Amino acid sequence: MTAIVELKNATKVVKNGFDEEKIILNDVSLEIFEQDFITILGGNGAGKSTLFNTIAGTLSLSSGTIRILGEDVTKFSPEKRAKYLSRVFQDPKMGTAPRMTVAENLLIAKFRGEKRGLFPRRLASYKDEFQATIEKVGNGLEK
């Protein structure tokens, strides 16, 4: 079975304001399969956001690889990587499109890179699918 997301020896090193290197991710390897429900826990500055940003492609790894559905996307631009994944923030109402519903955000993600056509009609046709996805996540976003 192919992992949906696979990180292998993922490392992210940054320089602070004094040219000192700080290791944010250190040789992280993980596999996420269909139907997995995972939680990433850690204190402030532990690397949770860095992990998600490297998977999404908004930050590059210093070393290691990222595969999505078996394809190495490590060097893909965020735009090219968006073909494979999107994310909705924990509180999407506070994110980059606060006036959009979670379902509207999911619709944009679903058709990224395609002509969108009649947005309300497409949204209505995927309403049940998106509602089921949102209910899996919970967190008060069901409505």
What kind of region is each of these model predictions?
Residues 39, 79-90, 94:
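ABC nucleotide-binding domain signature
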Residues 41-43:
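The feature captures the beta-strand-to-loop junction immediately N-terminal to the Walker
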Residues 72-86, 116-123:
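ABC ATPase NBD coupling module
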Residues 56:
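Helix-to-loop junction immediately C-terminal to a conserved catalytic motif
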Residues 28-39:
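Pre-Walker A (P-loop) beta-loop-beta motif of ABC nucleotide-binding domains
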Residues 99-115:
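Q-loop/switch helix immediately C-terminal to the Walker
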Residues 64-72:
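Conserved ABC transporter NBD signature motif
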